[in-house]
UniProtKB/Swiss-Prot annotation:
<keyword id="KW-0233">DNA recombination</keyword>
<keyword id="KW-0832">Ubl conjugation</keyword>
<dbReference type="InterPro" id="IPR013083">
    <property type="entry name" value="Znf_RING/FYVE/PHD"/>
</dbReference>
<comment type="pathway">
    <text>Protein modification; protein sumoylation.</text>
</comment>
<comment type="function">
    <text>Acts as an E3 ligase mediating SUMO/Smt3 attachment to other proteins. Acts in a DNA repair pathway for removal of UV-induced DNA damage that is distinct from classical nucleotide excision repair and in repair of ionizing radiation damage. Functions in homologous recombination repair of DNA double strand breaks and in recovery of stalled replication forks. Plays a critical role in meiosis.</text>
</comment>
<keyword id="KW-0808">Transferase</keyword>
<feature type="binding site">
    <location>
        <position position="214"/>
    </location>
    <ligand>
        <name>Zn(2+)</name>
    </ligand>
</feature>
<dbReference type="GO" id="GO:0000724">
    <property type="term" value="P:double-strand break repair via homologous recombination"/>
</dbReference>
<keyword id="KW-0234">DNA repair</keyword>
<keyword id="KW-0863">Zinc-finger</keyword>
<dbReference type="GO" id="GO:0016925">
    <property type="term" value="P:protein sumoylation"/>
</dbReference>
<dbReference type="GO" id="GO:0005634">
    <property type="term" value="C:nucleus"/>
</dbReference>
<dbReference type="InterPro" id="IPR026846">
    <property type="entry name" value="Nse2(Mms21)"/>
</dbReference>
<feature type="binding site">
    <location>
        <position position="219"/>
    </location>
    <ligand>
        <name>Zn(2+)</name>
    </ligand>
</feature>
<keyword id="KW-0469">Meiosis</keyword>
<comment type="subunit">
    <text>Two subcomplexes smc5-smc6-nse2 and nse1-nse3-nse4 exist. These subcomplexes are then brought together via a number of interactions, forming the Smc5-Smc6 complex.</text>
</comment>
<feature type="zinc finger region" description="SP-RING-type">
    <location>
        <begin position="164"/>
        <end position="243"/>
    </location>
</feature>
Amino acid sequence: MSEAQLKTSLEALSQNLLPGNQNHCSFDFQLKEIDDSIKQVIKCALVAAEIKNNECLDMLDSGIRELLDAKQRLLLMQQSVDTLANKTSENISDFENKSLLDIYTQIFKELIQEYEEKSDYGKYGTQGEYIEFKKTIWHEQNTDGSDFPSMKTFFNVMNTEEQEADEVMVYSATFDNRCPLTLQPIVHPILSTACNHFYEKDAILSLLNPTCVCPVVGCEARLQRSLLKEDEILERRLRRAQEISNLKEA
């Protein structure tokens, strides 16, 4: 197989996998479809938790896991193409009597087998989308501001190396709905993806120039506009916390 033939074969193999393609089989299209579906599942989970429909929550849990599996398969397909391209560029003579498709298939099988052998915690416990899914349900079911537990709680993980990779997603036991800048209840929250602290939107944006240190005492995270995002679930949680506070004061 000549170098030109090899290059042509690789391009054909990656046509429907690599980012940038516009057809419905492209990597970008499929990944976007999965991400959009995951967002819808999380929104449905909020409603299901609110009306205490546990059967629906179980179905949504299974659904989001299937979507995350599908997303991982896509990413591993892309990784397989990248690995194949690297291998061929290193030593083209190794591919004289081998089919690129067979080699690609073998690489993909090894990667997918490694993924499938992981525990449920290993597959989902540190995935941002699954953590958000569990957070959404937890905060709707625990409006008193209880700590969001370690993700290993949802998988019955005990003293394994996987615990070391657990996401740190703990909120204060006393849920403080006041902005660290205005010291007033937050009405329009914006969340820092750098440290998970949140603030009144206008207050923190006025502090950026173009960056600033997180105003929460003891936090040294440096903020910039691209690290701040609006979060409708957080806004809902803050609103519920304020409603509970008003009832207690009445």
